[in-house]
Amino acid sequence: MSLPASFDLTPEDAKLLLAANVHLGSKNVQVHNKPYVYKTRPDGVNVINIGKTWEKIVLAARIIAAVPNPSDVAVCSSRTFGQRAVLKFAAHTGATPIAGRFTPGNFTNYITRSFKEPRLVVVTDPRTDAQAIKESSYVNIPVIALTDMDSPSEYVDVAIPCNNKGKHSIGLIWWLIAREVLRLRGIIPDRTTEWSVMPDLYFYRDPEEIEQNAAEEAKTTEDVEEAAPVDADEWTGETEEVDWAESGATPAVEDAAASNW
């Protein structure tokens, strides 16, 4: 697929894709994903062509931006690493997020409270989000999916070849799609303007790791406070020696005592 020059992959974006290991695919290859394989490493890992990954990102963004009502786009992720990215994508683009377990009947059973009628569905992994793809096929909803080399492509209309198992790879792909959608909608004025949102915001964060970091920061703060030097003016264990015999109040006391006799 040939893209206009304005949609070309920039060196900065290529570095981001490589740094997040988007190009590292699985060892098994599904027959429909062979065109996306750049080469196979000696250890059996299939290297994905990031040029084709970028083309599919732009195509997916143009499809999403073409939907008049942003809430008619449903973004799903049953995979844990993609749930934070899906929620952030929905917050920035106005899509409808389905993070966590996909309730059967979301797209087909209108009696359920969570029933939805989206015009487009975007999923993180065709394997873990198989129920969403299956129900989309029943009601003729087009599907965009982040697919690894061994991912099934049945009922997937647009496949974005990438590493859909790493938390950095998943987060970066969702971030790039969101940025392209905002550029096409005109929220980001031109392609030379940097988006203020960093890709790190889309990365999965382990709750236990966050708590551990907070505890370490609190401990560091306590250590700093304990090690702070004490000023000379502050309270100490020493008391000043005062000669009460030489104080100005002694003669007055003696005079008062003498007058009583």
From Swiss-Prot:
This is Small ribosomal subunit protein uS2. It comes from Scheffersomyces stipitis (strain ATCC 58785 / CBS 6054 / NBRC 10063 / NRRL Y-11545). The modification N-acetylserine is found at S2. Transmembrane segments: none annotated. It comes from the Eukaryota. Required for the assembly and/or stability of the 40S ribosomal subunit. Required for the processing of the 20S rRNA-precursor to mature 18S rRNA in a late step of the maturation of 40S ribosomal subunits. Residues 223-244 have a biased composition (Acidic residues). The gene is RPS0. NCBIfam families: uS2_euk_arch. The keyword Iron does not apply. InterPro entries: Ribosomal_uS2, Ribosomal_uS2_C, Ribosomal_uS2_CS, Ribosomal_uS2_euk, Ribosomal_uS2_euk/arc, Ribosomal_uS2_flav_dom_sf. GO terms for biological process: ribosomal small subunit assembly; translation. Gene3D superfamilies: Glucose-6-phosphate isomerase like protein, domain 1. Component of the small ribosomal subunit. Mature ribosomes consist of a small (40S) and a large (60S) subunit. The 40S subunit contains about 33 different proteins and 1 molecule of RNA (18S). The 60S subunit contains about 49 different proteins and 3 molecules of RNA (25S, 5.8S and 5S). Interacts with RPS21. It is found in: Cytoplasm. GO terms for cellular component: cytosolic small ribosomal subunit. Keywords: Acetylation, Cytoplasm, Ribonucleoprotein, Ribosomal protein. GO terms for molecular function: structural constituent of ribosome. Belongs to the universal ribosomal protein uS2 family. Residues 215-261 are annotated as: Disordered.
